[in-house]
């Protein structure tokens, strides 16, 4: 019987070998090509600037008229661009709103994230209240937009509220509870303490007209 010549196996790492592997079917190659094509390209500087202009205009419109009362045409007009140009960056009003709310939630959570367990309780709580008041003063449109979203049932950020916001509040509530157990602050429900701070500080932005009407323009 004639002896069979030994079969030389090519390394799987070889590009030529991978192209001829049985697993590299046309369907799989097409799937890889589709996945590569679906990967978003990085935005250019001009594209990022355009998006920022649109988001700033949308913040102005949404905070003034709410989601339902706002239109793409209004946002385009405030942004100073045509409606087709705006739709190139954001095909739907919902996409603009969700993007705004996602970025807003990050900003809104930042003051609470700074509360440290190893800090002095009174200093930490006072600092948190001060930061929240500064946000109400410096970002009133964002605060009103967030309040409007809550009144609508938070359809665009409910997942972030139930995960990111809840996790952060749970963490800080535990810090407050520890301080209470150590006798450093009076005992109360830590969650309702946080809620009370939210209500007090955000009132100045969410009810700006009421505050100014009662206090007068000079004090409001």
Question: Which stretches of residues belong to each language-model region?
Answer:
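Hydrophobic alpha-helical segments that form the core
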Residues: 1-3, 7-10, 186-209
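Amphipathic alpha-helical segments used for helix-helix packing
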Residues: 124, 137-159, 207-216
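Amphipathic alpha-helical packing segments from all-alpha helical-bundle domains
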Residues: 106-113, 138, 155-182, 191-192, ...
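Generic hydrophobic, amphipathic alpha-helix propensity
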Residues: 50-58, 75, 100-104, 108, ...
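Helix-turn-helix
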Residues: 53, 61-95, 99
